[in-house]
């Protein structure tokens, strides 16, 4: 198949592949777990990394998820941009009126924070990015401490270099090591010193997406497997996944 760039690719279509393998792949991704599929030289699919001679193994990982804890225009702008970009976004807000605004903007998951001592249960996974967008010492310390004990691949906090240094010092005084606090990015964003909420949102989201791509990047490969299936009762958001391969 010729490409507009002047190159070409070969395409192999498997029209009647095993639906059970595709469904198992979907279910595992929907539960935020990575999954591998092996394609044998005969064209059959198998779940998992199978050491079959001549087979190719493809790995699929969960999509990026973003959790934002904060208040004000910065939080809302980032959540709105991330949602428009197709990123599953959770917004944790202290202000009930802002929570209503977020729901009107179409943010899928909005939680109202009550007191620092009663945070929502942490459900971050290795493909979750967490951003702190609040300037309150008690909330900062508690929210960052919670994020640090979790597996989020990205932890960031809005604020200046001086503010970031003070945050890390406070966390170290309550028992976190320097190595642990080094996980926190600050100041956040690919472009420094953004002042308005919209520009800051673009800068921060770009940094998060870059960090996610670095985490999931595979070695360059000449082969990719795209899963495109039409199965009843399976949300479209998980029907299409693609991945590069390694030799099984």
Predicted segments with their positions:
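Adenosine-phosphate binding glycine-rich loop
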Residues: 152, 158-248
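A short acidic, often aromatic-flanked loop/helix-cap motif at beta-alpha or helix-coil junctions
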Residues: 19, 116-119, 189-195
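Segments forming oxygen-rich coordination pockets for charged ligands
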Residues: 1-111, 125-129, 207-248
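Alpha-helix N-cap/loop-to-helix initiation residues
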Residues: 18, 75, 137-140, 164, ...
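Phosphate-bearing ligand-interacting subdomains
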Residues: 111-173, 201, 209
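Residue-level recognition of short, well-ordered coil/turn positions
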Residues: 33, 87, 151-152, 176
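Short, flexible segments with low predicted structural confidence
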Residues: 50-54, 118-119, 175-176
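Alpha-helix N-cap/helix-start motif
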Residues: 100-103, 140, 164, 197
């Amino acid at each position: 198949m010729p490409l507009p760039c002047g190159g070409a690719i070969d395409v192999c279509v498997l029209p009647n592949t095993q639906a059970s393998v595709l469904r198992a792949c979907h279910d595992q991704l929907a539960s935020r777990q990575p999954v591998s599929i092996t394609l044998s030289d005969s064209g059959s699919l198998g779940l998992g990394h199978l050491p079959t001679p001549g087979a190719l193994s493809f790995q699929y990982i969960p999509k990026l998820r973003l959790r934002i804890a904060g208040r004000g225009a910065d939080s809302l702008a980032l959540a709105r941009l991330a949602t428009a970009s197709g990123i599953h976004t959770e917004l944790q807000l202290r202000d009930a009126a802002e929570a209503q605004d977020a729901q009107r903007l179409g943010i899928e998951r909005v939680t109202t924070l009550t007191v620092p001592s009663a945070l929502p249960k942490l459900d971050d996974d290795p493909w979750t990015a967490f951003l702190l967008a609040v300037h309150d010492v008690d909330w900062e310390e508690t929210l960052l401490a919670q994020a640090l004990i979790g597996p989020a691949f990205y932890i960031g906090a809005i604020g200046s270099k001086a503010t970031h240094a003070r945050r890390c010092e406070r966390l170290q005084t309550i028992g976190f090591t320097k190595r642990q606090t080094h996980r926190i990015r600050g100041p956040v964003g690919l472009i420094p010193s953004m002042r308005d909420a919209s520009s800051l949102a673009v800068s921060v989201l770009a940094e998060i997406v870059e960090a996610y791509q670095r985490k999931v990047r595979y070695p360059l490969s000449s082969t990719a497997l795209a899963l495109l299936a039409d199965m009843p009762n399976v949300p479209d958001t998980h029907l299409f996944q693609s991945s590069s391969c390694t030799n099984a």
